[in-house]
């Protein structure tokens, strides 16, 4: 028996043992003939139950099974399934139905081949390949051999038992496989702030464009990190830097180191929360068109330690805001140093109405610009950069500061800041107000003049103040008395609106862009004939510039509603009783108002020019006006009268005065007319000299 099996194995495929199952006797006889012609050993049966019993009784006596698809006692696919589960033998299906769906169904159930009736000799000759393929697979799995037939059969039985056991324990096998797969998966790398900081340091040491994952991994020295992790993070980091460069217009390689690392860590936090890089608020605010808004972060100025409630001040090493006069041989101030403000309450008093928003309003709180004279610093270069950015061109002034300093103080070039007089800080109308006599006021075209150390502004901007009284129109916001400080500070709030933001249009001072010129040539364009007759000119050294057109502060602007009657009288009487013209006598001297000068405007109701150089509510003498201003002349014989109420028909028209008309004659004429005259369509009632009302 053993010798016969060994001989059959050496002559394979001769002697192949085949079990054929078909309920049709004709097909079964034809198949048997073909099998014998190919020198196979066939076993024929007509029912599936008999074939299944034979396989169970003698599982090692057959190498191959050929079964019909459609049988009476059992479906061929059912028999195929049972044989595959119990015996693990190769099964070939045959049928007269050659449809593709039927063939695919057979292959799906485990058939190794599908034959269409009538079966040809060529098909039968090639069936041995399935048996050979099956045996090679068993040999590979169990390291069996063909030394004799017994060993081959034993290997086949062992394989069948192993396969059956695995199928019975299919559920447990699936769970074990899932556990193995989860164990083999690579763990996800979490980028902590420390890892990201090491990554940023490595990238910027190598250069953003020259950094590669291999070199970055070598510099970071992290064992569990792979080049794929570094490459993914590097790609996201480059996209983040590109967005910053697009928003700010700056090269990422030129960012300050502290600012760069701070924003990178903030962006990492946003990345961990949202799954991608996102611009921080300090960078998001840089999309503003204001050039100073791009610096709107404490990290940009290396001032991360300041609290958000600190104020921004310009502080001098000797005296706060003690600016010298421009044009007296001052030298440029150097090295602004940032220091926190010690007492911000005094600074708020300088701006009782709460100045909000200007070209510097977007600078973050927490800075004091201290102008020191020693050496150079990064802050000085930063201020110079801010100056160049705001003007669109490099600064034409030497030094590391954007201002010219004189008299131990700091002031700015003529196209940015105005002159200073007597321990004050003064600025052009396009930047800051003008100060005189330790007060804080602005040029006449934007703000009104100051008297006796007070703070006064025109009716169209801010209320008027004199000698400790602060008067505001009813249609304006309430304000408080501005306490004059010996060391005035500049408080810059974070609000977005302010009257300062509207100052400084190009049509007012067309030559401001030329930094080689003083501001004086530009001012006469607004007042063409002031000072032409007696040589009076606008110079930085004159302290009485802001006092010109003193009476214009009491004129109502066209955009506001003036107050009349008892309401104005109740608020103007303290000013009339306290304002003295003697302060202006010594400073103003003689000056002429030219042909193009705007006419003097006077408010009605109880406003009178008193005697003894005082404005009071009492009735003065007729010669008080002439004695107060002996050199005051009105040169224009055709000076137009102006309505005080914005051009209405019932407005008060001032009388036209010729330069040759005597002032005393004018008063006598008014007396002769018994105090009543018609001027245009308005009506003037005289109760005293120059007291007119409706």
Curated annotation (Swiss-Prot):
It is found in: Nucleus. Residues 333-347 have a biased composition (Polar residues). CDD domains: REC_typeB_ARR-like (cd17584). One of its GO terms (molecular function) is DNA binding. Two-component system major event consists of a His-to-Asp phosphorelay between a sensor histidine kinase (HK) and a response regulator (RR). In plants, the His-to-Asp phosphorelay involves an additional intermediate named Histidine-containing phosphotransfer protein (HPt). This multistep phosphorelay consists of a His-Asp-His-Asp sequential transfer of a phosphate group between first a His and an Asp of the HK protein, followed by the transfer to a conserved His of the HPt protein and finally the transfer to an Asp in the receiver domain of the RR protein. Keywords: Activator, Cytokinin signaling pathway, DNA-binding, Nucleus, Phosphoprotein, Transcription, Transcription regulation, Two-component regulatory system. One of its GO terms (cellular component) is nucleus. The modification 4-aspartylphosphate is found at residue 68. Residues 213-238 bind DNA. Disruption phenotype: Dwarf, chlorina, lesion mimic, abnormal shoot, low tillering and low fertility phenotypes. It comes from the Eukaryota. One of its GO terms (biological process) is phosphorelay signal transduction system. InterPro entries: ARR-like, CheY-like_superfamily, Homeodomain-like_sf, Myb_dom, Myb_dom_plants, Sig_transdc_resp-reg_receiver. Pfam families: Response_reg. Residues 183-242 form the HTH myb-type domain. Residues 17-132 form the Response regulatory domain. Residues 326-349 are annotated as: Disordered. Belongs to the ARR family. Type-B subfamily. PANTHER family: TWO-COMPONENT RESPONSE REGULATOR, TWO-COMPONENT RESPONSE REGULATOR ARR10. Transcriptional activator that binds specific DNA sequence. Functions as a response regulator involved in His-to-Asp phosphorelay signal transduction system. Phosphorylation of the Asp residue in the receiver domain activates the ability of the protein to promote the transcription of target genes. May directly activate some type-A response regulators in response to cytokinins. This is Two-component response regulator ORR25. The lineage of its organism: Eukaryota, Viridiplantae, Streptophyta, Embryophyta, Tracheophyta.
């Amino acid at each position: 028996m053993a010798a016969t099996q060994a001989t059959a194995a050496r002559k394979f495929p001769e002697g192949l043992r085949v079990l054929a199952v078909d309920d049709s006797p004709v097909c079964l006889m034809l198949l048997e003939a073909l099998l014998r012609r190919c020198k196979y050993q066939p076993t024929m049966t007509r029912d599936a139950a008999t074939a299944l019993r034979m396989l169970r009784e003698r599982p090692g006596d057959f190498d191959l099974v050929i079964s019909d698809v459609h049988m009476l006692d059992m479906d061929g696919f059912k028999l195929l399934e049972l044989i595959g589960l119990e015996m693990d033998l190769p099964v070939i299906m045959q049928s007269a139905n050659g449809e593709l769906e039927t063939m695919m169904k057979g292959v799906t159930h485990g058939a190794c081949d599908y034959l269409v009736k009538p079966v040809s000799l060529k098909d039968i000759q090639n069936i041995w390949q399935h048996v050979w393929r099956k045996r090679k697979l068993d040999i590979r799995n169990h390291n069996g051999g063909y030394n004799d037939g017994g060993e081959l059969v034993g290997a086949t039985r062992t394989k069948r038992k192993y396969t059956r056991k695995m199928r019975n324990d299919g559920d447990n096998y699936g769970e074990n496989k899932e556990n193995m797969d989860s164990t083999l998966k690579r763990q996800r790398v979490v980028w902590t702030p420390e890892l990201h900081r090491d990554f940023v340091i490595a990238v910027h040491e190598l250069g953003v464009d020259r950094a590669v994952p291999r070199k970055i991994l070598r510099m970071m020295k992290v064992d569990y990190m792979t080049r794929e992790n570094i490459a993914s993070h590097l790609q996201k980091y480059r996209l983040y830097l590109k967005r910053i460069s697009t928003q700010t217009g700056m090269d990422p390689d030129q960012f300050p180191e502290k600012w760069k690392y701070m924003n990178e860590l903030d962006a990492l936090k946003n990345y961990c929360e949202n799954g991608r890089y996102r611009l921080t608020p300090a960078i998001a605010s840089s999309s503003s068109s204001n050039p100073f808004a791009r610096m709107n972060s404490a990290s940009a100025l290396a001032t991360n330690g300041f609290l958000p409630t600190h104020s921004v001040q310009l502080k001098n090493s000797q005296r706060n805001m003690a600016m010298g006069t421009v044009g007296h041989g001052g030298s440029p101030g150097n090295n602004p140093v940032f220091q926190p403000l010690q007492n911000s309450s005094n600074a708020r008093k300088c701006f009782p109405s709460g100045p909000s928003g200007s070209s510097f309003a977007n600078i973050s709180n927490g800075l004091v610009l201290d102008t020191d004279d020693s050496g150079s610093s990064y802050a000085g270069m930063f201020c110079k950069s801010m100056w160049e950015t705001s003007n669109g061109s490099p600064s034409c002034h030497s030094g590391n500061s954007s201002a010219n300093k004189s008299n131990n103080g700091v002031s700015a070039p003529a196209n940015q800041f105005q002159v200073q007089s007597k321990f004050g800080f003064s600025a052009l109308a396009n930047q800051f107000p003008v100060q005189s006599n330790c007060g804080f006021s602005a040029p006449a075209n934007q703000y009104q003049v100051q008297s006796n150390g007070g703070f006064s502004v025109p009716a169209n901007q801010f209320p008027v103040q004199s000698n400790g009284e602060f008067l505001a129109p009813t249609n304006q916001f309430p304000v408080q008395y501005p306490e004059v400080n010996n060391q005035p500070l500049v408080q810059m709030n974070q609000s977005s609106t302010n009257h300062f933001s509207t100052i400084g249009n190009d049509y007012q001072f067309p030559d401001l862009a030329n930094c080689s010129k003083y501001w004086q040539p530009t001012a006469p364009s607004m007042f063409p004939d002031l000072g032409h007759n007696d040589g009076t000119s606008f110079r930085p050294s004159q302290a009485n510039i802001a006092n010109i057109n003193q009476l214009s502060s009491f004129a109502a602007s066209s955009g506001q509603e003036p107050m009349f009657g008892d309401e104005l009288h109740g608020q103007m009487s303290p000013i009339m009783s306290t304002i003295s013209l003697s302060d202006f006598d010594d400073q103003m001297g003689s000056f002429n108002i030219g042909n193009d000068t705007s006419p003097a405007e006077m408010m009605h109701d109880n406003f009178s020019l008193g005697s003894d150089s005082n404005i009071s509510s009492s009735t003065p003498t007729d010669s008080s006006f002439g004695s107060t201003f002996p050199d005051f002349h009105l040169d224009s014989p055709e000076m137009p009268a102006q309505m005080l109420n914005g051009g209405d028909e019932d407005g008060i028209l001032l009388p036209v005065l010729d330069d040759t008309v005597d002032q005393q004659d004018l008063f006598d004429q008014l007396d002769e007319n018994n105090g009543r005259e018609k001027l245009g369509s308005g009506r003037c009632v005289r109760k005293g000299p120059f007291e007119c009302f409706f």
